[in-house]
């Protein structure tokens, strides 16, 4: 992280969200909704070496200082320079997301861009474009390759559009478009999110700078002996043969 980026991030960390803004200028926030990084890695059977693929800190460091970043996480203790940290609350994904949206609205933000951590191709310029398009649209959606969304931008005054959505059905994008009607939704370019090794293979074929890391991880997986591949593919990676060591690329 460069000096300028670090200064911006440090400023966000020590400064609470400011409620005084120029008249007519909307208050903007980025809502990052994510579990602890080790939980997200284990859920996908990804090794620690894949952490950069699920890292939102790089995007956060590029976002304009005028935009506050709020991380809603399941972690009991979380530090993220430049992020305002909140605990997720709710019985399921939908409730936790809706509660996060309500909290952001209570803090006085007019425009919100909600993202996760599983889209390595997401860039700060995508977030800036989303805020810009909210001037004329009810929603700005970033569709993923399966029909979900890697980004949802909305005005707090119209957050009811997000209530009752059947999330995680790969129909999120279609549901939200249907709710708004023609001409009220702006679509960003389709990007790939990473929920499985199959997604990593697709992502590795692209020209994103992180695609090289994806290729490296795939090469390490397929070069390993069969018994080690079985170990890597286990959901929580908790079982291993006595005295069996993980592949070098996956060592802690």
Predicted regions and their residues:
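N-terminal nucleotide-binding beta1-loop-alpha1 segment
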Residues: 10-40
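A short, N-terminal amphipathic alpha-helix
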Residues: 49-68
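Short, polar loop motifs at secondary-structure junctions
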Residues: 72-78
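Short phosphate-binding loop-to-helix
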Residues: 81-112, 169
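Active-site acidic Asp-centered loop
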Residues: 115-117
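Short, glycine-/small-residue-rich phosphate/pyrophosphate-handling segment
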Residues: 155-179
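Conserved alpha/beta core of the MobA/IspD/sugar-nucleotide pyrophosphorylase nucleotidyltransferase superfamily
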Residues: 174-252
């Amino acid at each position: 992280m460069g000096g300028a980026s670090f200064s911006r991030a440090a400023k966000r960390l020590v400064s609470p969200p400011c409620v005084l803004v120029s008249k007519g200028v909307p208050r903007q926030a980025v809502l990052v909704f994510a579990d602890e990084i080790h939980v997200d890695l284990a859920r996908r059977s990804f090794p620690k070496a894949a952490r950069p693929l699920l890292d939102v800190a790089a995007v956060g460091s590029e976002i304009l200082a005028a935009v506050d970043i709020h991380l809603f996480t399941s972690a009991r203790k979380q530090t993220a320079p430049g992020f305002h940290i909140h605990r997720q609350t709710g019985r399921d994904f939908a409730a936790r997301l809706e509660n996060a949206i309500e909290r952001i609205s209570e803090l006085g933000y007019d425009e919100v861009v909600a993202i996760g951590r599983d889209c390595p191709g997401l860039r700060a310029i995508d977030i800036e474009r989303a805020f810009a398009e909210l001037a004329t649209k009810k929603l700005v959606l970033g569709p993923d390759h399966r029909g979900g969304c890697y980004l949802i931008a909305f005005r707090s005054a119209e957050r009811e559009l997000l209530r009752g959505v059947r999330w995680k059905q790969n129909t999120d994008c279609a549901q939200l478009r249907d709710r708004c009607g023609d001409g009220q939704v702006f679509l960003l370019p389709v990007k790939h999110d990473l929920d499985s090794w199959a997604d990593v293979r697709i992502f590795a074929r692209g020209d994103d700078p992180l695609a090289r890391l994806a290729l490296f991880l795939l090469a390490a997986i397929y070069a390993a002996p069969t018994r080690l591949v079985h170990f890597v593919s286990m959901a929580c990676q908790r079982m291993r043969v006595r005295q069996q060591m993980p592949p070098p690329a996956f060592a802690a």
